[in-house]
Design a protein with these regions (language model features):
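A domain-start/cap signature at the N-terminus of enzymes
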Residues: 16-53, 87, 132, 137-140, ...
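Gly/Ser-rich "nucleophile elbow"/oxyanion-hole loop immediately N-terminal to the catalytic nucleophile
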Residues: 42-49, 98-128
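Active-site machinery of serine-nucleophile hydrolases
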Residues: 51-53, 57-105
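Short alpha-helix in the alpha/beta-hydrolase fold that links the catalytic acid
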Residues: 68-70, 180-190
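Primarily recognizes the serine-hydrolase "nucleophile elbow" in alpha/beta-hydrolase
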Residues: 111-114, 120-164
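Short beta-strand/loop motif that positions the catalytic acidic residue
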Residues: 164, 169-172, 176
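Acidic catalytic loop of the alpha/beta-hydrolase fold
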Residues: 175-180, 211
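Catalytic histidine neighborhood in serine/cysteine hydrolases
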Residues: 191-211
Length: 279
């Protein structure tokens, strides 16, 4: 894969072709691990080591072995709709059950070995089952993740102290019937009660159902907040200058550039059939 990346870079340099973004399906590269998408942004091959990494974890409805399904919502869908996300965007598929922090780190290790990137700016975000996965990954490997964001999730971790070691944002709707808000509140309460909440942001959206927070993935402010954090920041302070309210989500698509062509697909269909909002 490293040779492939180098060859593509040489091709772009020698022939001065127009910059383009690419979406690549990576399958069966990690024995017993997840299959996943790798999105490389425009101009990636000219600024590789400065490019951050985003890992998105989907909800239970997209579990399985059809990798195309995980493009239905989240950052990859936001990119197709015109949101500019200047990061290597990694979207694994969970075949079923809880997300495995170890397997997610195996994906990250594979990406680091095959795509030059800024390893001090790795971010994890997810929703529903992916919100659980996000808390589990960030709580287990806080020294490897620069910041995390969990929407309508929870955690399987008994010890949540790791979540207090990195900038972390939790959003949950009070009317969520799929994953009750208490699943997020118990995490917040543990961090607050232990005095380990200095890097924590949490928002309870009044009247929001399970699907409402999904629009966060389409908002510019989401990525501005993530990208403002770095492992090189000694004290790992959380950025509280950026806020996202439920009313903000109504304008989630207002500033996307719908004239931008979709990423060039290396493997997989160019259009995903719409089947409604499932998370």
């Amino acid at each position: 894969m490293k040779k492939l990346v180098c060859l593509i870079f040489m091709f772009l340099s020698l022939f001065q072709v127009s910059a383009h973004d690419f979406l690549r399906a990576v399958k069966d590269e990690i024995p017993g691990g997840y299959n996943f998408w790798v999105y490389t942004p425009v101009d990636y091959f000219y600024s590789q080591e400065q490019t951050p990494v985003i890992i998105f974890l989907h909800g239970a409805s997209l579990c399985g072995r059809n990798l195309d399904r995980v493009r239905r919502y989240g950052p990859l869908d936001a990119i197709v709709k015109g949101r500019d996300i200047d990061a290597l965007t990694i979207v694994p598929q969970n075949p079923g059950g809880a997300w495995s922090p170890k397997k997610i780190m195996d994906v990250l290790d594979w990406v680091k070995a095959n795509y030059p990137c800024d390893t001090t700016r790795v971010y994890v975000l997810g929703m529903s089952l992916g919100g659980y996965g996000t808390m589990d990954v960030c709580g287990t490997y806080p020294d490897k993740i620069a910041a995390g964001m969990a929407l309508c999730g929870g955690t399987s971790l008994k010890d949540v102290s790791g979540l207090g070691k990195l900038p972390f944002w939790i959003i949950h709707g009070t009317a969520d019937r799929a994953v009750p808000i208490k699943q997020s509140k118990v995490v917040v309460d543990k961090l607050v009660d232990s005095g380990n909440d200095s890097r924590l942001i949490y928002d309870w959206w009044q009247g929001a159902n399970h699907g409402t927070p999904a629009r966060v993935f389409y908002m510019k402010k989401t990525y501005e907040w993530l990208f403002s954090h770095c492992l090189l920041d000694k004290d790992r302070p959380v950025n509280r200058d950026i806020s996202i309210s439920m009313s903000d989500t109504r304008r989630a698509y207002s500033d996307v550039n719908r004239n931008v062509p979709a990423p060039e697909l290396i493997d997989g269909p160019s259009v995903i059939k719409e089947e409604g909002n499932e998370y």
